């Protein structure tokens, strides 16, 4: 995926689940860059969402890049199914997976991008060891599992830390920083300024208000106000 400024990834988890095809098409028409699909197993997080069948249905409804955020235990078992369903990138959780290096390598061998997600309470002091193995590092800015939570301010310092690590390793452009949760205009601005590359939002895009989705994409990108 070619990066042009901050990338916007609406999480389809926030949509009306009876109308996912329409939601995917609306996301594409809004000018967003990709669709974020939260897969939850009811064990790693206390919620259950989508599986490979739903991913395949979304894939049939859009040409956008599909990113699967696997909030599940034993993600290795589902990689092939996610790829066959149309995933372009698979992100696994540091806290949920054993043998992370093997999983990341396997994901890439399957022909798609790979990433690691970190929950808010997880230390990222060791992040440099994983950056060369990833296309994206996802920082959870809320507790994983549910929409509608408030942005955790400590995430901003984590973004700066990961950005510095990427620069030190000479991996600018090859490993992106993604922030997921509690994203609105204010938190998006702080994330952009700290060095985030991708912003994921669910409730922000799908709540009922007077701002259409295309305008919301522009607001998160900062384009309406000439921001970074």
Swiss-Prot record:
State the top-level EC class.
Answer: isomerase
Report if keyword Cytoplasm is assigned.
Answer: no
Q: How is the cofactor bound?
A: Binds 1 divalent metal cation per subunit.
Q: Which cofactors is this protein said to need?
A: a divalent metal cation
Disulphide-bonded residues = none
Tell me the residue numbers annotated for binding a divalent metal cation: 36, 38, 69, 180
Pfam families hit by this protein: Ribul_P_3_epim (PF00834)
Q: What is its EC number?
A: 5.1.3.1
What is the superkingdom listed in this entry's lineage? Answer: Bacteria
- What is one Gene Ontology biological process annotated in the Swiss-Prot or TrEMBL record? pentose catabolic process
Which reactions are catalysed by this chain?
Answer: D-ribulose 5-phosphate = D-xylulose 5-phosphate
Q: Where does this protein hold substrate?
A: 11, 69, 145-148, 180-182, 202-203
Recorded hits in SUPFAM superfamilies, A to Z, give: Ribulose-phoshate binding barrel
The record ties this protein, via CDD domains, to: RPE
Pathway in which this enzyme or protein is active: Carbohydrate degradation
Listed A to Z, the keywords are: Carbohydrate metabolism, Isomerase, Metal-binding
Catalytic residues at 38, 180
Q: Does the keyword Isomerase apply?
A: yes
* HAMAP family named in the record: RPE
State its role: Catalyzes the reversible epimerization of D-ribulose 5-phosphate to D-xylulose 5-phosphate.
Q: Which family does it belong to?
A: Belongs to the ribulose-phosphate 3-epimerase family.
- By its UniProt entry, which NCBIfam families does this protein fall under? PRK05581.1-4, rpe
Q: What is this protein called?
A: Ribulose-phosphate 3-epimerase
Recorded source organism is: Chlamydia muridarum (strain MoPn / Nigg)
Recite the lineage of the species.
Bacteria, Pseudomonadati, Chlamydiota, Chlamydiia, Chlamydiales
């Amino acid at each position: 995926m070619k990066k042009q400024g901050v990338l916007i990834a609406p999480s389809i988890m926030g949509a009306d689940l009876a109308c996912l095809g329409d939601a995917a098409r609306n996301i594409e028409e809004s000018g967003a860059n990709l669709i974020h699909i939260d897969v939850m197993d009811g064990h790693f997080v206390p919620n259950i969402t989508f599986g490979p069948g739903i991913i395949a249905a979304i894939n049939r409804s859009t040409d956008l890049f599909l990113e699967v955020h696997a909030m599940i235990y034993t993600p290795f078992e589902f990689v092939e199914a996610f790829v066959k369903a149309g995933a372009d990138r698979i992100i696994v959780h540091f806290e949920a997976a054993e043998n992370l290096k093997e999983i990341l390598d396997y994901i890439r061998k399957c022909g798609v991008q790979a990433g690691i997600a970190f929950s808010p309470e997880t230390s990222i002091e060791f992040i440099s060891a994983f950056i060369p193995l990833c296309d994206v590092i996802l920082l959870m800015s809320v507790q994983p599992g549910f929409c509608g939570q408030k942005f955790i301010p400590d995430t901003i310092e984590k973004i700066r830390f990961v950005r510095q690590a990427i620069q030190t390793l000479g991996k600018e452009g090859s490993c992106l920083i993604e922030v997921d949760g509690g994203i609105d205009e204010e938190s998006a601005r702080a994330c952009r300024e700290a060095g985030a590359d991708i912003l994921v939002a669910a409730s922000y895009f799908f709540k009922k208000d007077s701002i259409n989705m295309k305008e919301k994409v522009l607001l998160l990108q900062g384009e309406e106000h000439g921001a970074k």
